[in-house]
UniProtKB/Swiss-Prot annotation:
Zn(2+) 1 binds at residues 46, 68, 164. It catalyses: a primary alcohol + NADP(+) = an aldehyde + NADPH + H(+); (E)-cinnamyl alcohol + NADP(+) = (E)-cinnamaldehyde + NADPH + H(+); 3-methylbutanol + NADP(+) = 3-methylbutanal + NADPH + H(+). GO terms for biological process: alcohol metabolic process. This is NADP-dependent alcohol dehydrogenase 7. Belongs to the zinc-containing alcohol dehydrogenase family. It comes from the Eukaryota. Its EC number is 1.1.1.2. Gene3D superfamilies: Medium-chain alcohol dehydrogenases, catalytic domain (3.90.180.10), NAD(P)-binding Rossmann-like Domain (3.40.50.720).
Length: 361
């Protein structure tokens, strides 16, 4: 199959002009023996795309292509690829594009925590200085390990958000024993939190949804939550649900705004609070000494290839349907999505589609 020497994408010129992305051509990174090229057909828009675009996490390189929840078809395979990936496969690509594959973390299926050669799918330099370019583009080039086959019964627009948002909440659920007989809380019912409810329920847990007010109650119950707590409006909820939860996953955009003095009261002894929040880079978390007696708190980031495969298997077998709004890939489409994300007007994930009309005519 033919493919272009240069790729095209919708780029952000700088953080001050994030509402006006432009169509640009760019050189892909040099093709490696273990690389694949993927012709993109859909890409989810994650909150981290917005954080980067507006400069919350640091400087934005000129004409940066964002997007890291990618679905597409493999069009080129490196000479030393060994995962079984082949031309024509429909694959998903998440937030990671490279790891060292040699350290203890990589060898124990924790490559997402590799500190030796960790490259994100976008906005991250390779060792040669090339800045990775993401999925708001015609193609993406990356290591085969991070191109994962998608089950046939998961439509591309619904599969895309699983590759970052979905795996980010699934990994702590999986690692902390979410399943039948467990009581699991999800704090923050946004894009990731709504997937947390769906996935925890699909895994067999009793699910508690937590939000600040009552505006998310109806949606949370439709998603499958068994209980709903409006933390700023309901009275006496810490007493009502005392010692209730085995696991609480914090999906809100800010961890520092979580009231741990209240949250710890509803945790079982030995329970776990796991944060997957991705706040602004300067945010600080302050905890009272010994304020979490008998309860552990930790953080989690994305997930391994093995965990993504387990997630896709669960979604396929349980026919989990995340709530997605489709938008056309274009300068206007990306700007529209970011503008609505700024105001919180998303129910509950955006996926960019119509790549064939924009790039593959």
């Amino acid at each position: 199959m033919l493919y272009p020497e240069k790729f095209q994408g919708i780029g952000i010129s700088n953080a001050k002009d994030w509402k006006h992305p432009k169509l640009v051509s760019f050189d892909p990174k040099p093709f490696g023996d273990h690389d694949v090229d993927v012709e993109i057909e859909a890409c989810g828009i994650c909150g981290s795309d917005f954080h980067i675009a507006v400069g919350n996490w640091g400087p934005v390189p000129e004409n940066q292509i964002l997007g890291h929840e990618i679905i597409g078809r493999v069009v080129k395979v490196g000479s030393k690829c060994h995962t079984g990936v082949k031309i024509g496969d429909r694959v998903g690509v998440g937030a990671q594009a490279l790891a060292c594959f040699e350290c203890e973390r990589c060898k124990s299926d924790n490559e997402q925590y590799c500190t030796n050669d960790h490259v994100l799918t976008m906005w991250t330099p390779y060792k040669d200085g090339y800045i990775s370019q993401g999925g708001f583009a015609s193609h993406v080039r990356l290591h085969e390990h991070f191109a994962i086959q998608i089950p046939e019964n998961i439509p591309s627009p619904l599969a895309a958000p699983l590759l970052c948002g979905g795996i980010t909440v699934f990994s702590p659920l999986l690692r902390n024993g979410c399943g039948p007989g467990k009581r699991v809380g999800i704090v923050g019912i946004g894009g990731i939190g709504h997937m947390g409810i769906l996935l925890a329920k699909a895994m067999g847990a009793e699910v508690y949804a937590f939000s600040r007010g009552h505006s998310k109650r109806e949606d949370s119950m439709k998603l499958g939550a068994d209980h709903y707590i409006a933390m700023l409006e309901d009275k006496g909820w810490t007493e009502q649900y005392s010692n209730a939860l085995d696991l609480l996953v914090v999906c809100s955009s800010s961890l520092s705004k979580v009231n741990f003095d209240s949250i710890v009261k509803i945790m079982k002894i030995g329970g776990s609070i796991v944060s997957i929040a991705a706040p602004e880079v300067n945010e600080k978390l302050v905890l009272k000494p010994l304020g979490l007696m008998g309860v552990s708190i930790s953080s989690s980031a994305i997930g391994s290839r093995k965990e993504i495969e387990q997630l896709l298997k669960l979604v396929s077998e349980k026919n989990v349907k995340i709530w997605v709004e489709k938008l056309p890939i274009s300068e206007e489409g990306v700007s529209h999505a970011f503008t609505r994300m700024e105001s919180g007007d998303v129910k509950y994930r955006f996926t960019l589609v119509d790549y064939d009309k924009k790039f593959h005519k």
